[in-house]
Regions:
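Conserved alpha-helical substructure of the radical SAM core
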Residues: 2-143
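Short, histidine-centered active-site or binding-site loop motifs used for metal coordination
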Residues: 62-65, 150-152, 217, 264
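A general structural signal marking secondary-structure boundaries and capping sites
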Residues: 63, 162, 179, 246-249
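Amphipathic alpha-helical segments that form well-ordered structural scaffolds
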Residues: 68, 174, 241-245
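Radical SAM/AdoMet-radical enzyme domain recognition
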Residues: 74-95, 102-231
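Short, internal active-site loops enriched in acidic
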Residues: 99, 190-192, 263-268
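A C-terminal junction/extension of Radical SAM enzymes
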Residues: 221-290
Length: 290
C-alpha cells in the first residue's frame, strides 16, 4: 500500500490511525499512532464470508450468492476475535465476499469493539440502506470502504448487476448522513482507466475522504481477465493522473487520502519523480519507503 498523499504531498492523513491507532491510548477515537514500528501490530483483513450479492468479474475470492456454506460460525468467529484482541491487533477489517450478507456481522463488530478492536468493513455498498447505516454507526464500525470501479454503467458492467452504481452511491450517502467515515476502493483496468478524471470529480462531489486504487489481482475470477490489466503506458499515465490529482487536492485544501495498492513499484516511480522535482522531499520519501 503506497500512501500517495503522505509521500508525494507530505499530507497528514487518517490512514495510519485507521490501521494502527490505539483505543487504549487515552484518546477515545484511537487517533494516537505508535511512532515505533515495533509497537505497530499487524492489521487483520478477514474475509468473513464468500457470499456476495454481486457478480464482479474481477473478484479475487470468486464469491457468489451460494457460497456461504463453509462460513465460520458466530461462536468460532468470536473466539478468533478474542485471540486477535489478546495479540494486540489494533484493527480488524471485515471483508468477503460481502460482509453485510452475514446476519451476525453487527454482533461480531460490536463484540470486537468491546474487546478493544477497531472495526472496519469492506463492502460493495449496495446493501447499505438508511437502517443499515444507522446500525453500522451504532455497533461501532469506524470506517466503511466501498468498492466502485467506474461511474454508472462502467461500474455495473464490472459488478455484473444493473443498478449497482446507484445503490452504492446511496450507500455512501447513507453512511455520511449518520457520520460514518467513508472511502472508496477501485481496481484499475483497461475498462475504467480512461474514467480516472471522472472518478476524481466524483470524489470531490461526494466529499470522499479516502480512495485506494488497486492494481488488478490475477486470482479468483480475476485470473480469467488478465487481458484487462493495464499496459505499461496505461499504468504510467494512470499513476501520473493520480499524482497530479493528489497534488491538486493538496493545493486546494481538500483532505482526501489517496493510495495505491498491489504494486510497490508505484513507490519507486514516485521517488524517482520527486528526485527531479524536489530532491529534499525525495530524500525523506526514500527513508519512509525503506
Amino acid at each position: 500500500m503506497i500512501n500517495i498523499s503522505k509521500l508525494y504531498c507530505d499530507e497528514v492523513t487518517p490512514g495510519d490511525w485507521l490501521r494502527y491507532g490505539k483505543k487504549d491510548s487515552g484518546d477515545p477515537s484511537g487517533q494516537i499512532v505508535p511512532k515505533k514500528a515495533s509497537d505497530r501490530r499487524p492489521v487483520v483483513v478477514w474475509n468473513i464470508t464468500r457470499a456476495c450479492n454481486l457478480k464482479c468479474i474481477h473478484c479475487y475470492n470468486d464469491s457468489g450468492s451460494d457460497k456461504s456454506s463453509n462460513d465460520i460460525t458466530t461462536q468460532k468467529a468470536k473466539a478468533v476475535l478474542d485471540d486477535l484482541a489478546d495479540f494486540g491487533v489494533p484493527s480488524v477489517l471485515f471483508s468477503g465476499g460481502e460482509p453485510l450478507m452475514r446476519p451476525d456481522l453487527f454482533d461480531l463488530a460490536q463484540y470486537a469493539n468491546k474487546s478493544g478492536l477497531r472495526t472496519v468493513i469492506s463492502t460493495n455498498g449496495t446493501l447499505i440502506t438508511a437502517d443499515k447505516a444507522a446500525r453500522i454507526k451504532d455497533c461501532g464500525i469506524s470506517y466503511v470502504g466501498i468498492s466502485l470501479d467506474g461511474i454508472g454503467k462502467i461500474n455495473d458492467n464490472f459488478r455484473g448487476v444493473d443498478g449497482a452504481f446507484e445503490k452504492a452511491v446511496q450507500g455512501i450517502k447513507n453512511c455520511i448522513h449518520v457520520g460514518v467515515r467513508v472511502g472508496l476502493r477501485l481496481t484499475l483496468t483497461r475498462r475504467n482507466v480512461q474514467d480516472l478524471e471522472g472518478l476524481f470529480d466524483f470524489f470531490e462531489a461526494q466529499a470522499i475522504e479516502r480512495a485506494c486504487f488497486y492494481h488488478l489481482v490475477p486470482s479468483g475470477r480475476g485470473s480469467t481477465i488478465t487481458s484487462e490489466d493495464l499496459t505499461h503506458s496505461q499504468r504510467r499515465a494512470a499513476i501520473e493522473t493520480i499524482l497530479a490529482k493528489t497534488r491538486h487536492f493538496k493545493e486546494t485544501g481538500k483532505k482526501t487520502d489517496i493510495l495505491t495498492v498491489g504494486n510497490h513499484v508505484d513507490g519507486v516511480y514516485l521517488y524517482l519523480k520527486l528526485l527531479k522535482e524536489n530532491p529534499a522531499r525525495a530524500k525523506k520519501v526514500w527513508k519512509l519507503l525503506t
